[in-house]
Amino acid sequence: MSDDIPEIPQEVLDLIGKPLYEEETEFDIEMGYVYNAMAAVQNGNPLYWDKAVAEELVGAQIAPPTMLSVWFRPHYWSPGFEGERTALQSHFDMKRIMELPEAIISGNESIFGVPVKMGDRLKTYQTLRSVSDVKTTRVGTGRFWVIDVESFNQGGEHVGTDIYTCFGYRRPAQ
């Protein structure tokens, strides 16, 4: 253990392996978001632009698998919600609980399941998988943690998992 970084708090240890922040998409999956995303990166794949092609190839219009996290990004403001709304809330919890003022996403891996179709309603939850011993990198001293974000459609089918490796740290001068 580093002199500057305390042991992993029991509060964090108690969270490992437990589903956190279960939520459902605020709207049905729809093509407007898909068209905007594809236009932004100039992806002309007819699978996403041509309904007939999508029907022929996969039986329905679908969203690109890489858009999975888009469906759970909260709007900054929405009626009925109070306080700050952030995606990947468990990441911010780790920073706060472990008193690590800085943090980065140092790695991201995606596992894709069944395609996300137009009209789907998705559910998700976050799971803290692990927290490392104290590490020192070029940016500072802190800990790595891994968070899985698992997502399912309204039929309970797995549509994907995003695995985030995060590094929370203190800069050398902090």
Set out the residue ranges of the language-model regions.
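HotDog/MaoC-like acyl-thioester-processing domains
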Residues: 1-22, 105-174
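Hot-dog-fold acyl-thioester-processing enzymes
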Residues: 2-107, 173-174
